[in-house]
Every structure is written in structure tokens, then in C-alpha cells.
Regions:
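STAS-like cytosolic regulatory interaction modules
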Residues: 1-61, 67-107
């Protein structure tokens, strides 16, 4: 992903307990992020912490991917916590598209 990153944290059993991504979270990087999330979905532990930080930009394509990932985690009964590092403009963006409460949740 150009100007974006994706990291996984695993436990001793090789199950993913944490995901972190950030940078340019825009359409140009959405296919690679989708690939990473699809691969990660098969190896998630029972609880996962998802940290989204160092966001340079974020657009609706990434929001849609995150919502799809949330739906997948719900389907496979994975508990999750989101940690967001948002500036005021990014918080306003999420509020304006109607997703702020969903993203700041712990399930």
C-alpha cells in the first residue's frame, strides 16, 4: 500500500490479537487493505484490538471496508475494540457520514 501500512500482532498460537493500520487510507490503497483484512479474518483470535492511527487521509472506500470487516467479525463471533487516532476534521467526517458511533465502539 502506497503511503499506508498494515500490521498484525499475534499470540503464541499464531492467532491475530491486534491489527494496526494508518497513513493514506484512500481508494488507491483500498484493494490492498481489503486483501489484508480478508486474509486476517481467517486467523483472528476471540478478541481483537484494531488501532487506526497516523491517518493522513481517509475516504468512504476505507469506511466501507471497515464496516464489512466489522460485519465479518460479528458473523464469526469475534469481540473487537477500535482505537482511533483522529484529528478534529476526521472526527467531523465520520460524524457527517453517520458512522461515528459505530466506529468508536467496543463489541
Amino acid at each position: 500500500m502506497e503511503n499506508a501500512y498494515f500490521r498484525k500482532t499475534m499470540n503464541d498460537l499464531g492467532r491475530i490479537t491486534g491489527l494496526e493500520f494508518g497513513g493514506m487510507l484512500v481508494l488507491e490503497n483500498s484493494q490492498q487493505l481489503k486483501k489484508e483484512l480478508v486474509e486476517a479474518a481467517d486467523s483472528l483470535d476471540d478478541q481483537v484490538k484494531i488501532t487506526i492511527t497516523n491517518i493522513e487521509e481517509i475516504d468512504l472506500s476505507i469506511i466501507q471496508l471497515i464496516i464489512a470487516f466489522i460485519n465479518r467479525m460479528d458473523e464469526i463471533n469475534v469481540k473487537y475494540e477500535f482505537v482511533w487516532d483522529l484529528d478534529a476534521e476526521q472526527k467531523l467526517f465520520l460524524e457527517n457520514i453517520g458512522f461515528s458511533n459505530e466506529f468508536l465502539m467496543i463489541n
